[in-house]
């Protein structure tokens, strides 16, 4: 009886391990963002130009119930115009749980640790940085049997510090590639930095 129980437990653990292994997903993606800024940095402002920014990410999802999924992302929030140039990047570590996942939609909730690293050039140079923690939510709504989906995600610390995306995507049925496009808006407000960056983006994702 004892041997049977041990064998049953081992079989259950192996089955769960195999299920978790099948649920593992690793993805890499990047976007190009036609963004424009507004606001000021250390009291300096300008007539902002359109700016081609970028972001890239690595994402790991799995079937282990109690461990969060993870996504590391770097986004370029730089803005410029005339003698004004604000080079700003945001590095994010998103840890989240998938609350719902079915053939029609998925919903994620978690936290984001964000690190800002910037340098202002405006008749001189001024470096600055900032750490913050933000609430994270993401969702995707699928159109069955088409490969198309609508998606959105939000990171927010308060009403003056947020970053959201809304868009649509298409996943090819015969290759692990997804194309996407949409709108992104980020508002950054800390210390002597008060800027908003928004615009249309397009990009893709490759799943391993």
Q: What are these language model-derived features?
A:
Residues 64-148:
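Gram-negative (and chloroplast) outer-membrane scaffold detector with strong preference
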Residues 4, 22-26, 54, 66-68, ...:
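Outer-envelope beta-barrel architecture signal
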Residues 111-123, 175-208:
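Outer-membrane beta-barrel translocator/channel fold
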Residues 1-27:
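Cleavable N-terminal export/targeting peptides
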């Amino acid at each position: 009886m004892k041997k049977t129980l041990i064998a049953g437990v081992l079989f259950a653990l192996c089955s769960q391990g195999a299920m978790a292994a099948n649920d593992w997903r690793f993805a890499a993606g990047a976007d190009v963002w036609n963004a424009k800024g507004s606001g000021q940095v250390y009291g300096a402002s300008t007539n902002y130009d359109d700016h081609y920014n970028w972001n890239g990410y690595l994402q790991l999802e799995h079937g282990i119930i109690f461990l969060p999924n993870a996504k590391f992302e770097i986004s370029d929030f730089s803005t410029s115009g005339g003698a004004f140039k604000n080079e700003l990047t945001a590095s994010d570590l998103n840890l989240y749980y998938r609350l719902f996942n079915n053939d029609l939609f998925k919903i994620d909730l978690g936290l984001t640790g964000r690190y800002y690293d910037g340098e202002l050039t405006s008749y001189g140079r001024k470096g600055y940085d900032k750490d913050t923690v933000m609430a994270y939510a993401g969702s995707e709504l699928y159109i069955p049997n088409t490969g198309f989906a609508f998606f959105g995600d939000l990171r927010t610390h308060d009403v003056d510090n947020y970053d959201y995306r809304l868009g649509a995507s298409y996943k090819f049925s015969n290759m692990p590639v997804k194309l996407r496009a949409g709108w992104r808006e980020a508002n950054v407000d800390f210390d002597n930095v008060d800027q908003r960056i928004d615009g249309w983006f397009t990009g893709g994702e490759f799943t391993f």
